[in-house]
Amino acid sequence: MKTAAQIRELFLRFFEEKAHRRVPSSSLVPQNDPTLLFTNAGMNQFKDVFTGREKRDYSRATTAQKCVRAGGKHNDLENVGFTARHHTFFEMLGNFSFGDYFKKEAIAWAWELVTSERWLAISKERLAATVFAGEGTLPWDEEAYRLWEAQGVPPERIHKLGAKDNFWAMGDTGPCGPCSELHFFQGNDIPCAEEKAGRTCQGVACDCDRWLEIWNLVFMQFERGADGGLTPLPKPSIDTGAGLERMAAVVQGKRSNYDIDAFQSIIRAIEKLAGKRYGATDADDDVSMRVIADHARATTFLVGDGVLPANEGRGYVLRRIMRRAIRHGKRLGLERPFLADVCEAVMEEMGGAYPETRENRAFIVKVAGQEEESFRRTLDKGLAILETEMRKAIPPETHLGKPATPPPSAPRPVIDGKLAFQLYDTFGFPLDLTRVIAAERGFDVDEQGFDRNMAEQRARSEWKGSGEQAVGDLHKQIASELGETRFLGYEAPTARAEVKALLANGARAAKAARGDKVEVVTAATPFYGESGGQVGDQGSIAAPGGRVRVEDTRRPVPGLVTHVGVVEEGELAVGDLVELAVDDRRRDLIRANHSATHLLQLALRETLGDHVKQAGSIVAPDYLRFDFSHFQPLSEEELNAIERRVNELVRENAETETAVLKLEDARQSGAMMIFGEKYGDVVRVVRLGPSKELCGGTHVRRTGDIAFFKIGSEESIAAGVRRIVAYTGPQAIELSQREADELRRAAALFKAGAFEVAQKIEQTQKRVKDLERALDEAKGKIASAQSGDLAAQARDVKGAKVLAVRVQGDGKSLRELADKLRDRLGTGVVALGAEQDGKAILLVAVTKDLTARLKAGELVKEAAKLVGGSGGGKPDLAQAGGSDPAGLEKALAKVQELAVAALG
């Protein structure tokens, strides 16, 4: 039996023999494409090649591409585990032609690879093809039909389908074209919903799995703009996609993707953890194992590509995937963290094809473990919220000391749909879990309200691109017309160039006048456009009849540089020969910070370990910011070591070396790369002493030009990601001086030398603690004296004492007094109320022998409503606060009333 790994290799080798370049998978985080949430097709990394905006040194390519469909338009999340085919993560095998071959070769090679005994050896008799039937002004694809006939496919197995099935587009915009699919017949014994409804199975067009699509050949001929219009591509091209999991299922004779070897190895790891067998008798267990296997794959690869759990964007989708897996783990009875272990099984299965997963193993395992621990705590909070809301829905006297259940004679209360959705969205509760818990307690759930909130959330979370700098059609048009802007800024801060295009006040224009907000495009420029974390340059453009103040420099589409600013004098026109001048003093500050960022990354890896990976950066003139993977705060010793190491490298004054190399040569040289970054075939390598990185930014001539490096702050910004903000040169000196000034000021206040300040602070802290201890002792004596008097006021209820009284003091003194009173009462309930700083304080204590009948937390919650507040706590001790101290007497009376009712 051919394994999935062997099928992947056969596919790639087949096309290598057809003169295709084997190109590595791109990151799951799309580069330079704000229209995509995740990479979801093999052609994503070639989008600009298809549109002619990017050139490669090859015209044929083949890939095995990592893909995720779990958010935005392409969202398979909720189906995963319940069907044989749906996945969040999958591999897309593909071959591509960039204006080279077209339909004839694509169809012939697809047929050869699928049917040849040398390759995949799938039975010809079980294959069918589809072609575009035509729609609107687009004609049917007769050429593809004839080409399938030429391969020996009988006419009755070549089907014409409409645009819904046979016109492919990556998204709302971008490359598209008619397509032709290969389908594999699995058998008429597979159930069909159409037949169950008394209709006829639709064959290759049916949603049942009798005919399984295994390969889609897209004949890339158009680009769809934001207005929906189709523009012919410069050269017709080919984009094909074959899901590895589906192809492996067919080759291995499996009906479900989850039965192929690549999934079964992961499922075996889950079986071992759960002590259960996949495919035994419990269908729900099988669903959960499939969910966990799929979601562990998505987790492994998304985290490996730098996506981290978060509350928005890509991180939010990852968090939902991980939490869905964890929920299904609990369904399997996995009470201890397990997701990291399953991710290890994924890396074992797939690390050979994707070595980056093994390289990032420690990072992936740590993120998975931390998120699971966090979510398990969150899940418990969700259950507590649900319990609280159910208690609110029924009279408190019916549930004190026991789960909230309405009386049998009462109408069934309803859990609000908004709450049910909050539990789903925030705490990971699927609706069916809320429904089951509710039904056990005699509650119903407002499912229509849940659906309404779900629809609103989907509308909010729909991926609309990455913001105001999303690619615009005008920039695309200009880039298509003019090609790449030559960058001259490595050599000099000034240059002469012709104005090739102009945007004035957001519209394309031939000229611009004083006061106009403009984007100026020139044939070449010394200005660096914002990229790689380095901010764009500022400066000026001098024209024969005017002057532009350049406030920013951007790269709105790959290769195109625009100078953003305002016409300060006269006017500017397309065709003008202009003088471009970068603000070189500002550029020098940026150079120093950028070079320091490289040295900082080196020092971090030397000090903390090779798990440190760049997760983001900003290089500005006045500071640098560097985000990196690490799982705990840096100690003072580590921060000092990092700072010392960078300054050592600065003092070495090593000369900066740059080289332009082929990507593979750069990789072999050991140059640091940002994993997931999209690099061209030729890259620039920057060497600063022992630091060597791929980088297109501007740098100092020697490390000594950085002058001085100073860390300003270090903090956490996400699970497993830390952030350092640092300064160089004048800003670093200024920060050091400010710190020294503050130290001198503190020394003066303590009447001590600068190096004695820490000792003086420790001595002061000790004195404060001693005074607090003495104060507590005094309060304790007062409480003891008070408790004797107050205990006498307690009401006897069938052998238990109930005391509800207003006193003076803060929260701490109330707790001490309550402890004394409980000891004196023996068995009973104590409720104390006090006013402090215009606020109400309530405290309820219940002796241990009564907590089965009375819960302090429930009593204090009811009382808190009467002082305009809320609270909670343990069964034996709880506290609340409120904004209305005038209600204290009523609140204390309420506690006494509830306690007497429960005890009586």
Swiss-Prot record:
UniProt cofactor note: Binds 1 zinc ion per subunit.
Cofactor: Zn(2+)
InterPro entries per UniProt: aa-tRNA-synth_II/BPL/LPL, Ala-tRNA-lgiase_IIc, Ala-tRNA-ligase_IIc_anticod-bd, Ala-tRNA-synth_IIc_core, Ala-tRNA-synth_IIc_N, Ala-tRNA_ligase, Ala_tRNA_ligase_euk/bac, DHHA1_dom
Domains as described in the record: Consists of three domains; the N-terminal catalytic domain, the editing domain and the C-terminal C-Ala domain. The editing domain removes incorrectly charged amino acids, while the C-Ala domain, along with tRNA(Ala), serves as a bridge to cooperatively bring together the editing and aminoacylation centers thus stimulating deacylation of misacylated tRNAs.
Protein name per its UniProtKB record: Alanine--tRNA ligase
Disulfide bridge positions per record: none
Organism superkingdom: Bacteria
Organism: Anaeromyxobacter sp. (strain Fw109-5)
UniProt catalytic activity: tRNA(Ala) + L-alanine + ATP = L-alanyl-tRNA(Ala) + AMP + diphosphate
Gene responsible for this protein: alaS
Function noted in UniProt: Catalyzes the attachment of alanine to tRNA(Ala) in a two-step reaction: alanine is first activated by ATP to form Ala-AMP and then transferred to the acceptor end of tRNA(Ala). Also edits incorrectly charged Ser-tRNA(Ala) and Gly-tRNA(Ala) via its editing domain.
